[in-house]
Amino acid sequence: MDLVPSFSLETWVLLALSLVLLYRYATYSHGFFKKLGIPGPKPLPLFGNVLSYRKGMWSFDIECRKKYGNMWGLYDGPQPVLAITEPDMIKAVLVKECYSVFTNRRSLVPVGFMKKAVSLSEDEEWKRIRTQLSPNFTSGKLKEMFPIIKQYGDVLVKNLRQEAEKGKPVQLKEIFGAYSMDIIVATAFGVNVDSLNNPHDPFVSKARKLFRFDFLSPFLLSIVMFPFLTQLYEMLSISIFPRDSLKFFTKFVKKTKENHLESNKKQRVDFLQMMLNSQNFKDTESHKALSDVEILAQSIIFIFAGYETTSSTLSFIMYSLATHPDVQKKLQQEIDKTLPNKAFPTYDVMMEMEYLDMVVNETLRLYPVTNRIERMSKKDFEINGMSFPKGTGVMIPSFALHRDSKYWPEPDEFRPERFSKKNKENIDPYIYMPFGNGPRNCIGMRMALMNLKLALIRLLQNFSFYPCKETQIPLRLGSEALLQPAKPIILKVVSRDETIRGA
């Protein structure tokens, strides 16, 4: 039996030519940084460097920072990406040249109508949407929304108490995920759910499906290797967001608008209602109001952007406090002194608590949930005296910078004092960037901090947290694109007294 297929000469020539063309395609851009004299890890044909993310992008970036210094080049498939770490370079990209060159984030995947969301939209469309949304995230608006949010602090205490009373260590992510989901659904859509105790509520089940995708899945890898597939998928209405979830929220927003028009009531202060209210302003700027599709996209992106970040950060904070009991005790003392007898905080009091702010900031330094900041150049540009063409990606490895000994003594240690009033002045805002920086920073930053601080106050008023045999020490991080622990964080939870306010 012949081991080699019996093809005609023409077939063999065609096969060989196809392989040559495939190899040329798979490597055509991979000499880009070498020509410029910029160091970096060697890319693989088709994949570039993405397979090196299997241990986590954060791990890959730290290795590159140590090996290549302040700047290096990498490849996501055929896409050249320039990594920069110098504060002046970062400021130029995120602030000085934001509107002229680096307006847009990298568009990696098919998202359908979700490209209208503020974090995914581009150029003038992004500027208009951001301008419309920004007034909804001011301190004044958040104070109006605070009465909606504070009830979920009590639900959080009740749910955690129920788990703690079982006498077993508690897996935090499920409890904190429910708190995060409840607040997001309430503030984005004005719907009250207790997601921990009602996991089959359609709002809960459809929202949770938004997060179920793997950045190293065959679908997403196909886009990395063959970027032109994104346009094909868009034409076929294939998106990374589940179709049934998008359909559910589309119907809900449509129904909410109909009810709004019928009742002509505008007193609710959730984001959906505020966006619908803005459509009714009859002024010279009315042509800039958000369309129905844009309102839908913002409502969904609030869930997508807020759920994982809040629940994961809360888990990281409680782990840090449990493994640093002196810090936990000091924070409880500040809370008890500021809010005696488990008094409920006001928005202003909560935001003025100095040690609470220090603990949150230090946790966000150690565990920034989004461990990279990325932009796509829309014009030719210069960095460090070198010229780069339009279409070059630029990446800031924020996790690596947050753990860089050049800027942080003993960078892997949890030390809230780094963010004291005295020390905070010495922190470079282009090194510490848990919410990004510049005009395209996280629009929901104030909202996220409010949710985190409310949860921390209510939890530490009522409980103390301790490591147990199931607690992983030291904590190992996972490989997901959004930073998570490799294994769920499990802690022992002890009531501070018998009477828990709000439970």
Curated annotation (Swiss-Prot):
SUPFAM superfamilies the UniProt entry points to: Cytochrome P450
Broad class of the protein's primary localization: endoplasmic reticulum
Gene Ontology MF terms in the entry: heme binding; iron ion binding; oxidoreductase activity, acting on paired donors, with incorporation or reduction of molecular oxygen, reduced flavin or flavoprotein as one donor, and incorporation of one atom of oxygen; testosterone 6-beta-hydroxylase activity
Topology class, membrane: Peripheral membrane protein
Classification via Pfam families: p450
Endoplasmic reticulum among keywords: yes
Compartments it resides in: Endoplasmic reticulum membrane; Microsome membrane
Biological process annotations from GO: oxidative demethylation; steroid metabolic process
Name assigned to this protein: Cytochrome P450 3A14
Native species: Cavia porcellus (Guinea pig)
Name of the coding gene: CYP3A14
